[in-house]
Amino acid sequence: MAYKILVVDDSIFFRRRVKEILEQDPSLQVIGEARNGQEAIEMVATLNPDVVTMDVEMPIMDGITAVKKIMARKPVPIIMFSSLTLQGAKATLDALDSGAMDFLPKKFEDIAANRQDAVALLQSRVKSLCRKQHGLRPASVRVAPPKAILFNKPVSRNPAKRSVQATSSIPLGAPLYHSSSSGIPSGKKYRCLAIGTSTGGPVALQKVLTAVPKNFPYPIFIVQHMPGSFTKAFAERLNQLSQLTVKEAMNGEEVKAGVAYLAPGGRQMTVQGDSQRVSFRIYDAPDSADILYKPCVDITFASIAHVYHGDVLGVILTGMGSDGKLGASKLKSKGAKIWVQDELSSVVYGMPQAVMNAGIAEKEFSIDAFESHILKEMA
């Protein structure tokens, strides 16, 4: 039986092209088309789709408002189509905060031309969310503030920013801890934390980073699969929500302790240097069959392994595909510890599963448990 899809967009051309693309895959069936958010709410209630594709800008009711109402009344996986502008990036992040599970850039030219990479991307993203119907997160879940954890080497930083409630990305009733470990810190020496993620990552990263205290004594390197126009807005949002400084990494910038660096979208990020000084190399890489992502977790993690050797806690969060497996393997070979997000709390279990199946990961946690275990391990 085919998965049922509801397509929501005020453009009849875009709706029809999305329908044609999705139905090229026999496992996908578009059962309805809505012109605005209000129609989407009504059709979700009557048609029971497995997944909804949602535009942001629409008359009568916009996509963000519709997402909030759908997630409050009848939760269903939603994938947003967003313009590649700063405004579009901010709107998409709002939609993800409201409960949407994923997003895709809205590129009319790719859709119109029926480009095979665009076709494959849309079909794969929609099918991944169809498979993740169970265990939907609600629009918002209040999260208790983390207990204070003191580090031996406080770092200087700007005055603490305002605190806000984080949005949970795990289903209600999910266990908080899945590792067989007792949770006792290993006592290992660390010099940095490295995180790789893709689908579902924005909410997962927000959950983890908002729990990190301002005196965290190590740099944090983050690779999130995102378009170039999105990462700056995402870094700014995380910076507002977090106690520590979060910023988009810049070429040649010196790495500082207590700062979280987000890899710029559409480019590659590596670190270079020695024990005295580490800096970033941000560069444009040609398209390659071997490198599917910009930024790429494997590339960043490999450079971290070269500079920091085994003094690293490597984390792979929710995401599609297997990016991060090779990089995590290189970190592991140097003596680093590798943890992954569990299947139940992952929006898509592809990246964590690839690392688990390769025998690289030592521990597996739900996203709700990650923050406390990271802080305990690295304290």
Swiss-Prot record:
Stored CDD domains: CheB_Rec (cd16432), REC_CheB-like (cd17541)
Start and end residues of each CheB-type methylesterase domain: 186-379
Keywords assigned by UniProt, alphabetized: Chemotaxis, Cytoplasm, Hydrolase, Phosphoprotein
Modification(s) after translation: Phosphorylated by CheA. Phosphorylation of the N-terminal regulatory domain activates the methylesterase activity.
EC number(s) recorded for this UniProt protein: 3.1.1.61, 3.5.1.44
Entry GO CC: cytoplasm
Pfam families, sorted: CheB_methylest (PF01339), Response_reg (PF00072)
Active site, per annotation: 198, 225, 323
Catalytic reactions on record: [protein]-L-glutamate 5-O-methyl ester + H2O = L-glutamyl-[protein] + methanol + H(+); L-glutaminyl-[protein] + H2O = L-glutamyl-[protein] + NH4(+)
Molecular function terms, GO-annotated: phosphorelay response regulator activity; protein-glutamate methylesterase activity; protein-glutamine glutaminase activity
Protein name: Protein-glutamate methylesterase/protein-glutamine glutaminase
Organism: Pseudoalteromonas atlantica (strain T6c / ATCC BAA-1087)
